[in-house]
Structure formats: C-alpha cells, structure tokens
UniProtKB/Swiss-Prot annotation:
Residues 1-76 have a biased composition (Basic and acidic residues). The gene is SRC1. Keywords: Metal-binding, Repeat, Stress response. This is Protein SRC1. Residues 1-102 are annotated as: Disordered. Induction: By cold stress. Induced by heat shock, drought, wounding and infection by soybean mosaic virus (SMV). InterPro entries: HIRD11-like. It comes from the Eukaryota.
C-alpha cells in the first residue's frame, strides 16, 4: 500500500519523500523480529498512531487539488470547448427521418 502511495507522490511531485522512506525502512526491519511475539501487549499502543491517517487525508486533498487545479491557476481556468448545439428548427435541408413521414 505504501508503495502505491509513494509512486503517486513521485508522479505528482508531492514533498515529504524522506519521511516516507524512513518509515518504510523501520517497518521492513521490525516486521520479522516481532512477528507473533507480543500481539497482546501492543494492541493499546497502536491506537494512538492515527497521525498516519491524517497524513493520508492531506495527501488525498493534494491529489484532488492537482486534478481539479484549485489554487494553481491564479484565476485562469481552462475553458471547456463549447459544443455546437444542433438547432432543431424547420430547416431540414432535404433531410428526412421516419418521424417526418406523416
């Protein structure tokens, strides 16, 4: 999961890469050491580590800003191409349809 987030950060040029790399090193080193040893003791300690969820929320907001372009255009928004609306009038220019055969 963190690998996917890291690739998104690289693509969108979001800062904080050193912090993420540092976190990844610690998770990789300690996974094998504590596997199955102290599951009961650590349950209460991990509840306080919800700051990581806040970081994800900030990351998602940054991604949404990149997609929608909020704040980066400085008032210059890209205008969508106006589609030409077909005028349905009495001028058919020789075209007929099945509904015209009354």
């Amino acid at each position: 999961m963190s690998g996917i987030i890291h690739k998104i950060e690289e693509t969108l040029h979001v800062g904080g890469h050193k912090k993420e790399e540092h976190k990844g090193e610690h998770h990789g080193e300690h996974k094998g050491e504590h596997k199955g040893e102290h599951h009961g003791e650590h349950k209460g300690e991990h509840k306080g580590e919800q700051h990581h969820g806040e970081h994800k929320e900030g990351l998602v907001d940054k991604i949404k800003d990149k997609i929608h372009g909020d704040g980066h255009d400085k008032g210059e928004k890209k205008k969508k191409k106006d589609k030409k609306k077909k005028e349905h009038g009495h001028d058919h220019h020789g075209h007929s349809s099945s509904s015209d055969s009354d």
